[in-house]
Amino acid sequence: MLRVLLAFLLLLLVVPAAHAQPASAPPADAAAGQRLFNDMGCWQCHGYQGQGGESGPRIGPQPLPWPVFDNYVRAPSGTMPPYRASVLGEADLRKIHAYLTSLPGPSPNAPRPR
């Protein structure tokens, strides 16, 4: 009976921890992501803060969810060149995603980029 009770208590501790949300990206990841965003030239089409521009759509401040973002960057449609893992590794791409996620949203009165 004591073993069953201990097992039950252990489950009460383990199950919530398994379902806990992952920690948000540390600020260092976002700062490194901003440097990569600039170094890789993403800003040339998407603007310095991912707001979009003449040749690239808005990708920030609320980027696509990670799996969709990853797939799009690896095999984009349109004129964007593909950034294969040999050019931009997953860790670096996650940093760029963290940067885009960290950007503040646009002002409610700001005009929408074209």
Segments the model singles out, each with a brief description of its role:
Residues 14-38, 53, 105-114:
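Electrostatic cytochrome c docking/interface patches
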Residues 86-114:
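C-terminal capping alpha-helices of c-type cytochrome domains
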Residues 28, 32, 68, 91, ...:
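Extracytoplasmic/secreted proteins, especially bacterial periplasmic and envelope-associated proteins
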Residues 30-38, 44, 48-86:
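Gly/Gly-Pro-rich "capping" loops immediately C-terminal to redox-active cysteine motifs
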Residues 4-16:
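Bacterial N-terminal signal peptides
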